[in-house]
C-alpha cells in the first residue's frame, strides 16, 4: 500500500508523525529538565523583561548562556510576551539533591534534577511552565524544518529516487536525539534548522549551479544560523566549496561564482556580523567565549583536555542516538551497539556506492567540518561530548546511511526504506518510554504481590508502610541489595519529606545507605496522592570497603529536613524491616578488595583494631598492598572526616618500609596510628585514605581507577567509625 502513495504524501505522513512524537517527548519531559533548559529560559526571560541583550561575562554565560547569539531567545521571548509571569532571569526551580544517582545506568531512579509540582504539567497553571512549552513548540517548528530539509537534500542528490529521500527524512524525523532537541527550550533547534538549510542550499548550488536566489537563501541560512549558534559558522566552508566547485567546473564561471559567493557572504555578515562586533567591543573577543572557556577548563592543560575528550567518545556515540537531558536518561547498551552494527553495514555499502556527484561531495564536506568543529569544541570546553552540536549535519548523515544500506540491497529498495522507517519509528517509541518512565508518578498498586511481607507502620499520619521485600538475606561487600517498600500516602505534607534506608551493623555504624525523595524523586510528599499505594525499590550498594563479616539491620524511615528530625514510627525513629548477613569475601587479607591507584598500587585489604572510639583515643589502621608498578615511594594519608567535611584526625606519612624496596607484585602490609582530636563530637565519621608521590607529597594525589579504567577520584572512603564518649 505504501508503494502506491506518492512521495509527497508519504513525506507529509512522516512530518505529521514527527510532530506527534515531538509533542509526546515534550510532554514526557518536565520543565527545565532538558540540557541547560533553565539557562535558556533565563536568557529568554532577560530579553522579555529587559528588552536588551544580557552582558557577556563568565557569570551570565554560566547562568543565562549569554555567550550565545540571541535569535532563538528573541523569538521565544516574543511568542511568550502575552504571558504575565513572575519568574525572571534569576529563576531557580527547587533542586532534587539526589539527582544523578548512578546516572550512567538505565533506570528511573532520581533522573529528575528538579522537584516538580502538578502545575508544571498540562494544562499548565504555572506561567513559567507555559512559557517553557511555548518555546518548546517553537523548537518543534524548527525541528519540522530540519525534517523537511532532510527530504529536500535527498531529492537534490537523488532526484529520480524519492524513496531514498523518504528514508533519510524518516531517519531524521524519528531520531530520538533530534526529537528531544525539537521538544526542548534550546537554541540548538534553530541552529539545526538553519544549518541543515545551509547544507541543502550548498548542495543545490554545487549540483545545479548558482542563482541569485540561491545565493540569497544560502546567505540567509548561514547568517540566521550563526545568529542562533556560532557553531553553524563551520558550514561556511561547505558553502565556499560549492562556489569554488562551480567556478572550477568552467573557466568562464569564475566571475559569476565569485559574485554570487560575495553576495552570499555579504548577506550572512549583514545578518550576524554585528554580534561579533558587539562581543569584541565588550570583551575584546569576537566570540565572547575566552573567559567562559577558561572557567570551564579550569587549570586543565591541553593534554588532559584531549584525554578527557577521547574518554568521552563512547558517551558521545550514545548521544547520536538517544541520551536525554544531562545524559542521565540512558538506554541499555544493546541499543547503541545495534546501531553501531547497522552503521558499519552502511559504511560498507557507502564505499561500494562510490558517490562522486558535486552535491554528495559538498554533503560529505559538511559532515566533515561539523565533526571537526565538534572535536575542537570537545578539547576546548569540557562536557561538550554531545551530538546536539552537530545536529545540522544529521540530514546528510541520514542520507548517506540510507544510501549505504541501499547499496547492499539494491533490489530491495522499497522494503528497505519501509524497514528503515519502521525501525527508527519503533526506536523513537522505545526511547520515549525511558524518558516518560524517568519522570512519571509511580503506578498505583491494588494489592501486595505474593512475595511481599505485609506490615503496618504509620509515620505520624503522613504515610504508612504496608509491606516490603528484600532481594536477598545474604550479601558481600560491593554487592547491591534491593529494598522494596510499599507506601500508602495518607496526606500531602507542607514540606518535602525524604526517605532513608540504612544498613546498620552491630556497632551501630551505618554501613550503607540510600537517601531519596519518595518515588525515587518523582513522588514528592507535597504532591502525594492520598491512599494510592505504590512501590519504591531502593537500590542500596554496599561499599567495597564495608567491614565484614557483620549483621546488618535494614532500617527505613522518613526525614523532615526542615525540622532536622525523622518522623516517628511507633516508638522509634525508623522501621526495621529485617537483617542481612554481610559475609566476607574470599581473599588473603582482611576485608579483601581491589582498589587500583593509577595501576601503580593495589589496596587489597585493611583492618582496624576497633571501629568505636572515644575522642582523643588512637585508632590502629593496617593496610595490605600489592605494588604493581610503583614509580616512586608513596606518601599515604588517612583522615577522619565528619559529615560536614571537617577533619578530626590526620595520619600522613611515607609508607614504610619504602615501596621501592618491595618485591614486584608481592603482598605487603603497613600500619599507622590515627589519633582523634580530643574535642571530636560524637557521631559517625568517614576514614578517608589516599596516596601521593613522595616527591610531591600532598600536592598531586594518585587517582583511583575503576575496573574499566575511568577515574573515580583521588581518595577512597575506606571505613566508617563511630565516636562515643
Features from the language model and the residues they span:
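Transmembrane-helix signature of polytopic, membrane-embedded enzymes
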Residues: 9, 104-122, 126, 150-174, ...
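Transmembrane alpha-helix segments characteristic
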Residues: 17, 166-168, 354-377
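Interfacial juxtamembrane loops and adjacent helix segments
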Residues: 46-136, 296-303, 323-332
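Membrane-interface transmembrane helices that cradle and orient dolichyl/undecaprenyl
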Residues: 155-159, 198-217, 247
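Perimembrane helix-loop-helix junctions
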Residues: 201-207, 235-269
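Membrane-interface alpha helices of multi-pass inner-membrane proteins
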Residues: 214-230, 235-236, 270
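Membrane-lumen/periplasm interface segments of multi-pass, membrane-embedded glycan/lipid transferases
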Residues: 280-354, 460-469
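C-terminal luminal/periplasmic domains and tails of membrane-associated envelope-modifying transferases
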Residues: 433-725
Amino acid at each position: 500500500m505504501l508503494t502506491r502513495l506518492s512521495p509527497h504524501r508519504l513525506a507529509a505522513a512522516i512530518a505529521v508523525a514527527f510532530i506527534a512524537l515531538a509533542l509526546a517527548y515534550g510532554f514526557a519531559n518536565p520543565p527545565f529538565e532538558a540540557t541547560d533548559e533553565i539557562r535558556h529560559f533565563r536568557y529568554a526571560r532577560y530579553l522579555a523583561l529587559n528588552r536588551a541583550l544580557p552582558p557577556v561575562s563568565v557569570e551570565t554565560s554560566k547562568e543565562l548562556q549569554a555567550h550565545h547569539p540571541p535569535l532563538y531567545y528573541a523569538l521565544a521571548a516574543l511568542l511568550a510576551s502575552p504571558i504575565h509571569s513572575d519568574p525572571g532571569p534569576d529563576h531557580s526551580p527547587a533542586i532534587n539533591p539526589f539527582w544523578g544517582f548512578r546516572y550512567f545506568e538505565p533506570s528511573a531512579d532520581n533522573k529528575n534534577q528538579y522537584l516538580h509540582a502538578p502545575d508544571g504539567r498540562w494544562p499548565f497553571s504555572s506561567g513559567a511552565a507555559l512559557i517553557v512549552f511555548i518555546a518548546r513548540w517553537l523548537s518543534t517548528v524548527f525541528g519540522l524544518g530540519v525534517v523537511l530539509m532532510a527530504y529536500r537534500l535527498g531529492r537534490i542528490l537523488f532526484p529520480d529516487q524519492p524513496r531514498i529521500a523518504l528514508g533519510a527524512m524518516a531517519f531524521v524525523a524519528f531520531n530520538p536525539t533530534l526529537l528531544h532537541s525539537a521538544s526542548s527550550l534550546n537554541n540548538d533547534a534553530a541552529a539545526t534548522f538553519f544549518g541543515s538549510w545551509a547544507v541543502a542550499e550548498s548542495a543545490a548550488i554545487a549540483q545545479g549551479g548558482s542563482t541569485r536566489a540561491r545565493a540569497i537563501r544560502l546567505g540567509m541560512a548561514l547568517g540566521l544560523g550563526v545568529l542562533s549558534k556560532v557553531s553553524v559558522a563551520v558550514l561556511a566552508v561547505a558553502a565556499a566549496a560549492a562556489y569554488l566547485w562551480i567556478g572550477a567546473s568552467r573557466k568562464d564561471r569564475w566571475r559569476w561564482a565569485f559574485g554570487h559567493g560575495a553576495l552570499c557572504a555579504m548577506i550572512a555578515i549583514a545578518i550576524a556580523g554585528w554580534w561579533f562586533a558587539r562581543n569584541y567591543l565588550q570583551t575584546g573577543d569576537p566570540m565572547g567565549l575566552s573567559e567562559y572557556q577558561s572557567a570551564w577548563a579550569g587549570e586543565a592543560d591541553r593534554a588532559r583536555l584531549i584525554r578527557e575528550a577521547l574518554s568521552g567518545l563512547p558517551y558521545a556515540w550514545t548521544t547520536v542516538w538517544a541520551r536525554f537531558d544531562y545524559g542521565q536518561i540512558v538506554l541499555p547498551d544493546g541499543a547503541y551497539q545495534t546501531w553501531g552494527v547497522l552503521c558499519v553495514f552502511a559504511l560498507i555499502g557507502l564505499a561500494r556506492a562510490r558517490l562522486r556527484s558535486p552535491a554528495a561531495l559538498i554533503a560529505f564536506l559538511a559532515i566533515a567540518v561539523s565533526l571537526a568543529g565538534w572535536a575542537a569544541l570537545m578539547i576546548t570546553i569540557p562536557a561538550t561530548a554531545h551530538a546536539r552540536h552537530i545536529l545540522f549535519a544529521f540530514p546528510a548523515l541520514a542520507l548517506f546511511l540510507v544510501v549505504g544500506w541501499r547499496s547492499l540491497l539494491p533490489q530491495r529498495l522499497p522494503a528497505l526504506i519501509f524497514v528503515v522507517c519502521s525501525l527508527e519509528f519503533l526506536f523513537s517509541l522505545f526511547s520515549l518510554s525511558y524518558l516518560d518512565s524517568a519522570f512519571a508518578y509511580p503506578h498505583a498498586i491494588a494489592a501486595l504481590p505474593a512475595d511481599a511481607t505485609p506490615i503496618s507502620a504509620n509515620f505520624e499520619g503522613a504515610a504508612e508502610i504496608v509491606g516490603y521485600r528484600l532481594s536477598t538475606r545474604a550479601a558481600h561487600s560491593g554487592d547491591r541489595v534491593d529494598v522494596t517498600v510499599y507506601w500508602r500516602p495518607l496526606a500531602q505534607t507542607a514540606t518535602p519529606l525524604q526517605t532513608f534506608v540504612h544498613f546498620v551493623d552491630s556497632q551501630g555504624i551505618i554501613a550503607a545507605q540510600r537517601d531519596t525523595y519518595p518515588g525515587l524523586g518523582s513522588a514528592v510528599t507535597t504532591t502525594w496522592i492520598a491512599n494510592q499505594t505504590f512501590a519504591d525499590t531502593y537500590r542500596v550498594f554496599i561499599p567495597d570497603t564495608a567491614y565484614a563479616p557483620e549483621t546488618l539491620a535494614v532500617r527505613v524511615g522518613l526525614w523532615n529536613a526542615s525540622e532536622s528530625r525523622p518522623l516517628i514510627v511507633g516508638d522509634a525513629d525508623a522501621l526495621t524491616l529485617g537483617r542481612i548477613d554481610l559475609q566476607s569475601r574470599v581473599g588473603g587479607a582482611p576485608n579483601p578488595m581491589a582498589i587500583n591507584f593509577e595501576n601503580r598500587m593495589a589496596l587489597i585489604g585493611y583492618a582496624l583494631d576497633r571501629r568505636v572510639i572515644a575522642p582523643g583515643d588512637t585508632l590502629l589502621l593496617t593496610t595490605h598492598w600489592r605494588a604493581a608498578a610503583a614509580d616512586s615511594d608513596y606518601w599515604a594519608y588517612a583522615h577522619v572526616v565528619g559529615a560536614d567535611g571537617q577533619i578530626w584526625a590526620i595520619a600522613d606519612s611515607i609508607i614504610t618500609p619504602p615501596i621501592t624496596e618491595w618485591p614486584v607484585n608481592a603482598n605487603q602490609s603497613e600500619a599507622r596510628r590515627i589519633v582523634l582530636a580530643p574535642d571530636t563530637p560524637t557521631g559517625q565519621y568517614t576514614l578517608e585514605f589516599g596516596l601521593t608521590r613522595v616527591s610531591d607529597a600532598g600536592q598531586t594525589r594518585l587517582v583511583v581507577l575503576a575496573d574499566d579504567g575511568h577515574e573515580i577520584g583521588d581518595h577512597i572512603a575506606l571505613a566508617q567509625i563511630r565516636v562515643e564518649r
